């Protein structure tokens, strides 16, 4: 065992986030961390990395254990280059480099310092650190970041910084790696490379905690720990094993919860019965006896009613395998999920909604796409597939810019819009469109959630009311306190849910989705998949989530 985690309480103001998070980490163990958006996964990593010490409990690492984590935010980077940022984040490389670079200037004839210097040289050579910069350069190329090697970190996009963090952790050579949402912004090649690296670390005894809802990654872990109900539950095995164990545990938990509910009902009736018997009695000792029984029932009732309802979620495939009684119980007690309301009952036509004929597209005389042909009709699905930089987002922007008059997040910056040099692009002007982009329009970022929803409806010339806003927030699991939070301060999962509200506002007949599962938790991803599979309109989508792609399927347009 390299670490023992025991968090007895973690709070934010009056909100208690954790009350009983306990688990240990073994040598070489690969653990996936899952849980609903806002449950405390990021907070757990902040505690484990030492950046958050405001909690009750104890984190014990085995002596000598080194820990590295992917940074979630980047501040005060000054002008540090990408390569230096990565090298500074490699604990052993940094410490050995310090000795090798600094000792010659002052060690003189000091035997101890000479020995330390000699040992550092041997270790540096043993770890092949003389080649580390070349290895990192190749890795940057594999992640399509070959041109950022000497660029300042602060000049990179959020997605590029995330990939740099992954490269840093892949070369960190630590005992425990804390990895946050690694595959967001990765294409399918980079993602497979990351998964291969995770599998390869089995022989090097590196332990990992990976916060992710990427089911491809969760399929390669040794254990999954789910944060729920203020605590943590451990499931041995990978994602498929987790689903089976979770279904069994949830079924058992619902039986226990139902028994508690019955006990509460029984106790409430007993309190009333004892009150009536007490009032009817004329014997003082009998009155006292009923009073004691009433108080005892009230005390037990009070304790039971303090218990919060547990979180109950079972994946849809496992639900189909439940017996009738358990399935009915689940419908009664299941945790609330987002409600994705998409048109599914309308008569389905086969009219063309989008087309491209021998289109050539690019930026500033640089051609990215040639001979693009699309014939998309209602109730059809088109997947755009290719590596990052292959032109998927470019094609989407070109369709929306040339095919119709639709506001894009960067529409005001004409330099960022592609040019169609040849051929035709067209979107049916009679259909309504919903677009899920990876970035939220700047004009919404400083608005509160409530005002942003109101504004997006006004932008689409749609009626909106306070009642409607509150209903939408309820449907997408926002609380009343979330209404006043600026969009830019929402979590990744909350921003994703706001995006879904935005794209569905006008009851679209064509959905254009650019990595829609990024940041969503597992139940929300599953609900989105189910809604899209029932959808009667047309879909153009980009996704590197293999589970999501297998559900939606559709024709594939390979780019690059």
Over which residues does each language-model region extend?
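ABC ATP-binding cassette signature C-motif
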Residues: 1-257, 336-560
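Flexible nucleotide-interacting loop at or near the entrance of a catalytic core
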Residues: 114-133, 251-367
């Amino acid at each position: 065992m390299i670490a023992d985690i025991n968090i007895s309480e973690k709070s934010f103001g009056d909100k208690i986030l954790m009350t009983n998070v306990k688990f240990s980490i073994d040598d070489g163990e690969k653990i996936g961390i899952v849980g609903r958006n806002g449950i405390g996964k990021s907070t757990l990593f902040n505690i484990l990395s030492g950046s958050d010490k405001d909690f009750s409990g104890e984190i014990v690492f085995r002596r000598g254990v080194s820990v590295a984590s992917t940074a979630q935010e980047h501040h005060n980077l000054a002008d540090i280059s990408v390569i230096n940022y990565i090298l500074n984040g490699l604990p052993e490389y940094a410490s050995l480099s310090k000795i090798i670079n600094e000792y010659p200037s002052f060690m003189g004839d000091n035997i101890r310092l000479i020995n330390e210097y000699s040992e550092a040289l041997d270790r540096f050579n043993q770890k092949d650190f003389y080649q580390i910069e070349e290895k990192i350069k190749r890795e940057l190329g594999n992640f399509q970041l070959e041109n950022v090697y000497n660029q300042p970190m602060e000049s990179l996009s959020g997605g590029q910084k995330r990939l740099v963090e992954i490269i840093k952790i892949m070369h960190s050579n630590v005992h425990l790696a804390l990895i946050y949402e690694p595959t967001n912004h990765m294409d399918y090649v980079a993602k497979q490379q990351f998964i291969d690296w995770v599998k390869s670390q089995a022989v090097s005894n590196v332990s990992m905690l990976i916060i992710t809802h990427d089911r491809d990654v969760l399929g390669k872990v040794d254990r999954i720990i789910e944060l729920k109900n203020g605590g943590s539950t451990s499931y041995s095995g990978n994602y498929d094993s987790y689903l089976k164990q979770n279904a069994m545990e949830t079924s058992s938990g619902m039986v226990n919860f139902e028994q508690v509910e019955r006990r509460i009902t029984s106790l409430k009736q007993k309190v009333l019965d004892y009150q009536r018997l007490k009032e009817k009695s004329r014997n003082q000792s009998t009155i006292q006896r009923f009073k004691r029984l009433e108080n005892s029932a009230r005390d037990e009732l009070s304790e039971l009613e303090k218990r919060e309802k547990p979180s109950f979620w079972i994946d849809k495939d496992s639900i189909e395998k439940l017996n009738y009684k358990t399935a009915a119980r689940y419908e009664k007690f299941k945790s609330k999920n987002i409600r994705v309301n998409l048109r599914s009952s309308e008569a389905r036509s086969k009219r063309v909604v989008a087309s491209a004929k021998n289109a050539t597209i690019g930026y500033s005389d640089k051609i990215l796409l040639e001979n693009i042909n699309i014939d998309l009709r209602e109730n059809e699905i088109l997947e755009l597939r290719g590596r990052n930089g292959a032109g998927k987002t470019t094609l989407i922007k070109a369709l929306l810019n040339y095919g119709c008059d639709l506001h894009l997040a960067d529409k005001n910056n004409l330099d960022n819009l592609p040019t169609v040099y040849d051929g035709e692009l067209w979107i049916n002007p009679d259909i309504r469109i919903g677009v899920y982009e990876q970035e939220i329009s700047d004009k919404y970022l400083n608005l509160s959630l409530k005002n942003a929803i109101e504004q997006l409806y006004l932008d689409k010339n749609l009626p909106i009311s306070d009642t409607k806003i509150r209903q939408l927030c309820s449907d997408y699991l926002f609380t009343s306190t979330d209404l006043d939070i600026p969009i830019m301060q929402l979590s990744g999962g909350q921003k994703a849910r706001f995006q879904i509200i935005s794209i569905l506002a006008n009851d679209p007949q064509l959905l254009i989705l650019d990595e829609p599962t990024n940041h969503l938790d597992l139940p929300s991803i599953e609900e989105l998949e189910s809604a899209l599979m029932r959808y009667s309109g047309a879909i153009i989508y980009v996704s590197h989530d293999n589970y999501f792609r297998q559900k939606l399927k559709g024709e594939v347009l390979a780019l690059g």
